[in-house]
Amino acid sequence: MGKYFGTDGVRGVANKELTPELAFKLGRYGGYVLAHNEDKKHPQVLVGRDTRVSGEMLESALIAGLISIGAEVMRLGVISTPGVAYLTKEMDAELGVMISASHNPVADNGIKFFGSDGFKLSDDQENEIEALLDEENPDLPRPVGNEIVHYSDYFEGAQKYLSYIKSTIDVNLDGLKIALDGANGSTSQLAPFLFGDLEADTEVIGCSPDGYNINEGVGSTHPEALAKTVVETESDFGLAFDGDGDRLIAVDEKGNIVDGDQIMFIIGQEMAKNQELNDNMIVSTVMSNLGFYKALEAEGIKSNKTKVGDRYVVEEMRKGNYNLGGEQSGHIVLMDYNTTGDGLLTGVQLAAVVKLTGKSLSELAEQMKKYPQSLINVRVTDKHGVTDNEDVKAEMDRVEADMNGEGRILVRPSGTEPLVRVMVEAATDEKAQSYAQQIADVVEEKMGLDN
């Protein structure tokens, strides 16, 4: 991570950390680095946003910065992050920009860039933008007079994106009753329209954004709200999106949460059956549940683990030409159709599996037995040296032997704080908690901040 760019673009409290001044500079310098094409006088840039009240303020500043460098800007309005990624590639734009802080609270906002291929930026591209941000007055082009171009609105872009999502399945969803939760964010209008157009009967919550209520008690980070709705309305299942629509968490007809691991397994199983799963491989992160790997093994499907973060999943998928990957948190990447996690796309694919198999979502999800998980954070003096400590290693080996293949240990440093996360999965809740505590106690004793 750089000085400005985190794992998913530039984020901060809007108007305090992510100010209009910074948004202007990101537009100007980001536009120069990513869209400045010697052969094209006015590179095309697409800009979308979620429903946060600060979005319009940052959008105006960002667009001003882009126009100041000579870009021709098309404003997409409220749309999902994967919608921007898809349209950038589909419309041969030089650059796509999304203004959103995803599942974060309303006070936060963020700016993330997509290259002309629809993928997020490389580290080198981010470093180049950061270098310009740190310069006082970089000598960059400044068009004047009739060289300055108007920006235009292309709100029809959302419909173009939805038509594409609809085309990725060969079945209508008539006969299915689906509860939808738009997190009062980017998918609030998109999701009901899409699933209605596919002839599903829909129940809707979290689709009344007012600029302030994004992710508030709804969406993929609060699936309990949708679970209640699914049970009360006797829906076949529910789909909960996050604020910018790049994640999906589902709920079965009984109100049970179906997470990203289970969704990947269900879709991957169907793809493998139809011989559509490249190299019979699914890419996930180290945080995926042990039950996920055991279920894949039973199906003869291979798995590949990356560091936590959807950008690492996408990197691995591109490297190996794999077409399914994702995270337990609900970022699912279906590379045949889009370049980034896409909640609406994943929801449509999952619904199609339910329709085509004739099975309930609970039946499909039950094929993957989730192992109970316990997570303990320990503040330490050296977060990167914990797994090299002999006492910690010995305790991990002891617990590993005790679990006898019916569990998993993961001890990893936090990306942002001076702590390590001790995660244990075991056959029962009690065992997971007990084993995690035993390891955490040794970490605390040998390397804790207070010792």
UniProtKB/Swiss-Prot annotation:
GO MF entry, a single one: magnesium ion binding
GO BP terms, alphabetized: carbohydrate metabolic process; peptidoglycan biosynthetic process; UDP-N-acetylglucosamine biosynthetic process
Known cofactor(s): Mg(2+)
GO cellular component terms attached to this protein's record: cytosol
Coiled coil ranges: none
Listed InterPro entries: A-D-PHexomutase_a/b/a-I, A-D-PHexomutase_a/b/a-I/II/III, A-D-PHexomutase_a/b/a-II, A-D-PHexomutase_a/b/a-III, A-D-PHexomutase_C, A-D-PHexomutase_C_sf, A-D-PHexomutase_CS, Alpha-D-phosphohexomutase_SF
Residues annotated as the enzyme's active site: 102 (phosphoserine intermediate)
Classification via CDD domains: GlmM
Record: residues binding Mg(2+): 102, 242, 244, 246
Catalytic activity: alpha-D-glucosamine 1-phosphate = D-glucosamine 6-phosphate
Similarity section: Belongs to the phosphohexose mutase family.
Protein name, entry field: Phosphoglucosamine mutase
Species: Staphylococcus carnosus (strain TM300)
